[in-house]
Swiss-Prot record:
<dbReference type="GO" id="GO:0006412">
    <property type="term" value="P:translation"/>
</dbReference>
<keyword id="KW-0689">Ribosomal protein</keyword>
<dbReference type="InterPro" id="IPR023626">
    <property type="entry name" value="Ribosomal_eL39_dom_sf"/>
</dbReference>
<comment type="similarity">
    <text>Belongs to the eukaryotic ribosomal protein eL39 family.</text>
</comment>
<dbReference type="InterPro" id="IPR020083">
    <property type="entry name" value="Ribosomal_eL39_CS"/>
</dbReference>
<dbReference type="GO" id="GO:0022625">
    <property type="term" value="C:cytosolic large ribosomal subunit"/>
</dbReference>
<keyword id="KW-0687">Ribonucleoprotein</keyword>
<protein>
    <recommendedName>
        <fullName>Large ribosomal subunit protein eL39</fullName>
    </recommendedName>
</protein>
<dbReference type="GO" id="GO:0003735">
    <property type="term" value="F:structural constituent of ribosome"/>
</dbReference>
<dbReference type="Pfam" id="PF00832">
    <property type="entry name" value="Ribosomal_L39"/>
</dbReference>
<dbReference type="InterPro" id="IPR000077">
    <property type="entry name" value="Ribosomal_eL39"/>
</dbReference>
Amino acid sequence: MSHNMKGQKKRLAKAHKQNTRVPVWVIVKTNRKVVSHPRRRHWRRRSLDVK
């Protein structure tokens, strides 16, 4: 990670932040119609297209 460019690190950080679960209040508000996150990514199963 030490030789990465700042832009790439920034994009990796954004991907890291986006990779979170659906908030509990959303699940409660939608009466459990929304429980899964379609863009959720597992580090071993799906790779990132970071340039």
